Each structure stands twice: as C-alpha cells, then as structure tokens.
Amino acid sequence: MKVLLLEDVKNLGKAGEVCEVKDGYGNNFLIANQKAKLATNEVINKYKAEVKKKAEKEALEKAQKLQMVETLQTITLTIHKKVGANGSLFGAITKEEITERLKEQHASLNLDKKDIELKHPIKSTGIYEIEVKLGFGVVGTFKIDVVAE
C-alpha cells in the first residue's frame, strides 16, 4: 500500500514523501492517526498544490515584512516625556508606548509590541536605536528621539 505522509514518521520518512507500507500499518496506524493518506494521484496533486500555495503566501508575507523594514529605517519617532532635574524621565518608555506612538505617527505601520526588541526600558532623554524582529528572519531598526516636554 502506498501512502502520502502528512507529517514526519520515525523510521519511515518525512512529510510529503510517498512510502510503501504494509496494509495493516497503513490503515490501522498511519491513516487512523491522520499521519498519512492513501497515495492516489488526486491526493498527491492536492498536497503539492497546498504546499505551493503555502510557499507563495510565505513569500508574499516576507516581501511585505522587508518593505516594512525599509520604511522603518527612514523613521525617527519623537516621544515627548516629562523629565526630572537630572535628565531622567518620570517613568520609562516601554514597548507598549513605542507601538502606540508608532501607530499615532505612522498609521500604515502595524507593529505589535512583541516585534520590538528592547534590552531595557528607556529612562533618559536622547536618541535610541530600536531593533524590530518581524519573523521570517527579517530584522530592522528605527530611531526614537526622546525629548523633554
């Protein structure tokens, strides 16, 4: 019996491979546990189409992320905060505040706070470079200018 593996199976093969197995193993374990499907031409073609569609979708998402990084690199986000006598801020600037200000000043950029990498909260005025990880190995930076109110 030939089956198309839907996921990696130890000692048999990887997802997407067509394997020859005994009828009992194929029906009672692989197909019953949805680890494989009976390998007909229709099933194989459908699986290949799904894989191709998924790859195209990922390529499109990666291109959008790369375009977002290019836009981010041109941005300097200005944040006005109250400052004490020694130049330190009252409170700190966190990921949440950065994403809120980005949405206010640049509505086209849709970043989530989990995308922003802050090693520590910003507690004083100055210009800071913020790293953004958008997935698919896409990493970018933008600048934040913290000024006294």
UniProtKB/Swiss-Prot annotation:
Biological process according to GO: translation
Pfam family, one: Ribosomal_L9_N
UniProt entry keywords in alphabetical sequence: Ribonucleoprotein, Ribosomal protein, RNA-binding, rRNA-binding
Keyword Membrane set for record: no
Family: Belongs to the bacterial ribosomal protein bL9 family.
Protein name: Large ribosomal subunit protein bL9
GO function terms (MF aspect): rRNA binding; structural constituent of ribosome
GO cellular component labels: ribonucleoprotein complex; ribosome
Record-annotated membrane-spanning stretches: none
Role noted for this protein: Binds to the 23S rRNA.
PANTHER family: 50S RIBOSOMAL PROTEIN L9
Gene behind the chain: rplI
HAMAP family: Ribosomal_bL9
UniProt xrefs under PROSITE patterns: RIBOSOMAL_L9
Provenance organism: Helicobacter pylori (strain G27)
